[in-house]
């Protein structure tokens, strides 16, 4: 990347998904000197959060790719990796809510995945920008 990109993350300290996702995002940012990371708390920035709702909800973490050269948003991602998003949707379709058993299952998935899906999601998200850069 030749253009400075800020990875703006909206999150909260209590977010279980963020605990799994943020270390991977940090490593991605470290790979390119034009990447920057900024973290803001959802509850302290309601106006910002309202611009990046997921199905009408304030789901976090939400990662916004802000292009500093064009002063524009290139993309946003979150609140979960693609595989985890499907797992959540499928479970909610069958059970209506995410119970403690599912939440444990999701954490086991995160541990086994070791950030691979997050990396692949971001490669897919960033690939068009790399080609155009």
How would you label these PLM feature ranges?
Residues 8-11, 25, 34-48, 66:
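Thiol-based oxidoreductase modules, predominantly thioredoxin-like and allied folds used
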Residues 62-64:
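Residue-level detector of beta-strand face positions
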Residues 18-19, 31-37:
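Short, solvent-exposed secondary-structure capping/transition elements
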């Amino acid at each position: 990347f030749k253009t400075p990109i800020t990875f703006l993350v909206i999150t909260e300290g209590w977010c279980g998904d963020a605990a799994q996702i943020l270390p991977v995002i940090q490593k991605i940012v470290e790979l390119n000197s034009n990447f920057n990371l900024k973290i803001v708390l959802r509850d302290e920035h309601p106006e910002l959060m309202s611009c990046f709702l997921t199905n009408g909800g304030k789901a976090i973490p939400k990662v916004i790719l802000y292009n500093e050269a064009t002063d524009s948003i290139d993309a946003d991602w979150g609140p979960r990796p693609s595989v985890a998003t499907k797992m959540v949707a499928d479970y909610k379709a069958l059970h209506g809510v995410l119970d403690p058993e599912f939440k444990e299952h999701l954490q086991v998935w995160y541990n086994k995945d070791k950030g691979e899906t997050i990396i692949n999601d971001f490669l897919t998200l960033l690939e068009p920008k790399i080609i155009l850069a």
